[in-house]
């Protein structure tokens, strides 16, 4: 597959800038819509035949970037066929309130390279490269923490586990604390936390709990590039949801997926851009010297992880680019 990393970077940067202009205004829906529109417009300039496999929802519930939507400059004659997963603004409430951790995210692969996950919850445990292979989704929390600590050559009391602050995690939170590990509760943004768990120096050693299945697939795409690991299982709410999963080709709803199974693509591209400051990426900064963004772009076909600082000049002739 043609290297789309710089094109994908441009998409998440434009979405981040658009949503950052709404930051702190208290309107999560407007922030998300700004990111969606910017992302859609930018993707339609890329010479590719793209299909949204994870997006804003079903066609009848999302005006743009719905599952099955075609994107790309179709009149370019391109034969680059790609599946695309997007979270135009992960942490819409974070952006609306000006809180830390909002990012824009896109992953792409050859056709069939990303699991078509239903919009439901997914149990997850996420660790970095050092603890890869040491955890078990069905194991007791304390056992997993012992295994992670052993791999990281530290005590359990030196571990930091990120958990979404939800009522459903009450028992999980108790078990983590009872084992002696520390917890960082977050209101939103488990995708960003999952990436941070696989990057040394972020202060995050694991992510546990249930969150969105689409975010789980996006996290898996990032972890394929970072050599991290996610183990996940879909959470079935009722018979109607089970039937919907089976219609999407998921026969065994109790199956535990690993990183490779969630994102099996041979040519994965993953990009994220900070909207507000977070553990991994700085947020968008509007200055007299242009607009500054910080992004991460990763690929598997030519393994590389790039942290990119960009100054967007906005066609202003008097803007000065400074050495940083």
How would you label these PLM feature ranges?
Residues 32-111:
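Flexible, acidic active-site loops/lids enriched in D/E/S/T/G that coordinate Mg2+ and/or position polar
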Residues 44-45, 70-79, 87, 95-99, ...:
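Solvent-exposed alpha-helices and their adjacent loops that cap or buttress functional pockets
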Residues 105, 110-186, 248-251, 278-285, ...:
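Acidic beta-strand-loop-alpha-helix segment within the catalytic core
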Residues 189-190, 199-227:
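Glycine-rich phosphate-binding loop
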